Amino acid sequence: MSAAVLKALIAEITHRCPLHCVYCSNPLEMHSVENELSTAQWMRIIQEAAELGCWHLHLTGGEPLSRKDTEQLIRAGREAGLYVNLITSGLGLTQERLQQLVDAGLDHIQLSFQDSEEAEANTVSGTRAHAYKLRVAEWIREHRLAFTLNLVVHRRNVDRLEQLIRFAERLKADKLEIANVQYYGWAFQNRAKLLPTLEQVRASLRIIEDARKRLTGTMRIEYVLPDYYAKYPKPCMGGWGRGLMLIDPAGRAMPCHAAAVIPGLEFPNAGELSLRSIWEGSAAFQRFRGEAWMQEPCRSCERREIDFGGCRCQALMLAGDAVATDPVCSLSPSRKFVEEAIEMAVAHDTKSQVWVYRIDPVALKT
C-alpha cells in the first residue's frame, strides 16, 4: 500500500458530557477531568498534526464545550491552517460563546439531536435538552458557519424518518447526517431495543433516496446504514491507521475511538511523544495497516482494498478475534453471530424493555 497520510485529527478533548444517551459511543471506561491533557499539550498536538499534512481538525468529546479552552484550541487549529469542526450537543453554548468560537476561527459546527419530538429526544438523552438545542440551532444560522445536523436513528424512531428530515429542513441545516446506531460502547448494552428490523432498513433507504432527489442543491443528506444489515462491512475509519488519528482526553493516540478494547495493543500517548513518531512508528498503528495481517477470506478477497477487512473492534466483540473478518460481512464464517443478534433483537418487545442509561438520569435529578 502507499504511505499512510494523516488527513484528519479527531481530538476527543474531554469525556465530560451533560447527556446520558442510551447509545453513547464513548468507551465504557472514561477519563476524568484530572487526566485530561492541558491546553498547551493540545496546541502542540494540533501544530504537529498540521506539519504531518493533516487537513481537518474535529473537536469532540464528550461535550467539547465542557472545557474552557475550546476557543484557544480552535484558534490553534486555524493558525495551523486546519479546517476546524466542532461536534457538540449544544449544551453549554450561549450566543456570547458562539460568537467567541466564530471569532476564534471555527469553520463548521455539527449539532446533535436525539429526535425531532421533544419527549422522545429527552427520553433517549436522559435529560431535558431538546428545547435548548432548538435555540442553539437558531443561533448557529445567524453566523456564516457550515452547519451539519446529526440525527441518530434506531428501531424506535426510524419509522418517522420523513418527519426527521423535515425537522432538519426547518432548522436550515446545510447537511443532514442520519446515522444508525453503531453498536460499540454503551450502545451494545441497548442493542436489542435499538436495532431496527430489515423491513425498517429497506423502507428507510427508499425515503432517503427520495429526499436526496427532492433536496438536491438545498441540503445534503448522508445516511449511515446499520452494519448488521450490510452485505459487506464498512471501511471502518477509512482503514486502520490509513488517514485518521483519534486522541482521547488523556492523550492516548488510537486509529479509532473503540480501539482500546483490543487486548495486546499498547497505544502511545501524544502528550508525551510526537505525532510523527506515533503515526509512522507506533506498533499499534502498524498492527492492522496494510494487508499482511489479513486472514482468509479477506487475504484473497477483491474487496480487501475497499473495506480493509471491516472493523477490528466489531470482529473482537462479535467473533472474539480482532484479526477475524468483520462478522457483518456476508463472506465471514462468523456471520452467524450477527444473524443471532438480529433474531434476538427482533424478538424483543421494545415497548416493555427499559433503557440502560450511561448514567442514571433519575439519580442525578436532571
Each model region followed by its residue ranges:
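Conserved alpha-helical substructure of the radical SAM core
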Residues: 1-108
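Short beta->alpha junction loops/turns
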Residues: 14, 63, 90-91, 114, ...
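Flexible loop residues that form catalytic
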Residues: 29, 62, 114, 181, ...
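Conserved phosphate-coordination/catalytic loops
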Residues: 36-40, 127-131, 292
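Structural motif corresponding to alpha-helix initiation and N-cap regions
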Residues: 39-43, 67, 94-95, 118, ...
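Short Fe-S-cluster ligation motifs
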Residues: 45-61, 326-366
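Radical SAM enzyme [4Fe-4S]-AdoMet core and its adjacent flexible, acidic
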Residues: 83, 99, 103-108, 112-254, ...
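Accessory C-terminal segments flanking Radical SAM cores
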Residues: 223-337
